[in-house]
Amino acid sequence: MARILDNNVMGNEEFSDRTLRPQYLHEYIGQDKVKEQFAIFIEAAKRRDESLDHVLLFGPPGLGKTTMAFVIANELGVNLKQTSGPAVEKAGDLVAILNELEPGDILFIDEIHRMPMSVEEVLYSAMEDFYIDIMIGAGDTSRSIHLDLPPFTLIGATTRAGMLSNPLRARFGITGHMEYYQEKDLTEIVERTATIFEIKIDHEAARKLACRSRGTPRIANRLLKRVRDYAQIIGDGIITAQITDRALTMLDVDREGLNYIDQKILRTMIEMYQGGPVGLGTLSVNIAEERNTVEEMYEPYLIQKGFLMRTRTGRVATQKAYRHLGYPYQNT
């Protein structure tokens, strides 16, 4: 059941995400600090009739970075062209995209930290001075061509801002840190989604579902669909608090939003390593998960909720983790 709490987009969810996606800042639930800042920056750019400064959106998966990029484009009334770091394999791929931009357009690059360095370097002059120099030919016949670009806004999204090179990071004039959502905001998102898909759910059920969604709208919407299925087959189609509890228990999602893998990580640390410290590589081998999967998918939420600490000597399970899983805690 761990995939239910996977932050990555799955299968036909891309269509659902588009259906649920707010169009403007006033429709966007949560991320109040980021919204307040962007509202000012966007309005200032519009009054000056200028392109918005380049924007870097960073934070864990599923928190609305792509949605925010589309909202910014709608607020500015401009076109958005979308690609991703892994999709832009060669400098020529990026040059072709940049050459198609119209004045004021937004270029959105998801997973920008995964862009090859040779491609990234093309962005430096494009972002700073709106031009690129491209090499034509090879050997003695090669020559450089200067290509001017219209003013545009680059929006980069990343889950790993620390992997961006300093020259690239320095060229973003605006940064937006997308944080895990508060319970009240996630509850509102669940109720909004239920309204759009005509799902009957009471407020307490929506709150319970929000509490167990790891602070992530994408997970909240995914869980809502599975609880809807449960309510239709086991109940009368109406999602109540009791139905929600039963469905999420069936899905191995506990009251703190921890799934089977989360609990396996903590139990392994407590039972085999006396709570730690234990190295990430050793932990990954013991739970049969890839190192990057543990570090990017599971650890951030466990740390944010206070179940896990990163130290110089390794990962350590906290007293809260012991209590939550029913283990006696001894402070050694």
UniProtKB/Swiss-Prot annotation:
What SUPFAM superfamilies does this protein map onto?
Answer: P-loop containing nucleoside triphosphate hydrolases, Winged helix' DNA-binding domain
Stretches for region Head domain (RuvB-H): 255-332
- A single GO cellular-component term on record: cytoplasm
Disulfide-linked positions = none
Give the reaction(s) catalysed: ATP + H2O = ADP + phosphate + H(+)
Which InterPro entries does this UniProt record tie to the protein? AAA+_ATPase, AAA_lid_4, DNA_helicase_Holl-junc_RuvB, P-loop_NTPase, RuvB-like_N, RuvB_C, WH-like_DNA-bd_sf, WH_DNA-bd_sf
GO annotation terms (biological process): DNA recombination; DNA repair
What ranges does the record give for the region Large ATPase domain (RuvB-L), renumbered to this chain?
A: 1-181
Subunit details for this protein? Homohexamer. Forms an RuvA(8)-RuvB(12)-Holliday junction (HJ) complex. HJ DNA is sandwiched between 2 RuvA tetramers; dsDNA enters through RuvA and exits via RuvB. An RuvB hexamer assembles on each DNA strand where it exits the tetramer. Each RuvB hexamer is contacted by two RuvA subunits (via domain III) on 2 adjacent RuvB subunits; this complex drives branch migration. In the full resolvosome a probable DNA-RuvA(4)-RuvB(12)-RuvC(2) complex forms which resolves the HJ.
Q: What is this protein called?
A: Holliday junction branch migration complex subunit RuvB
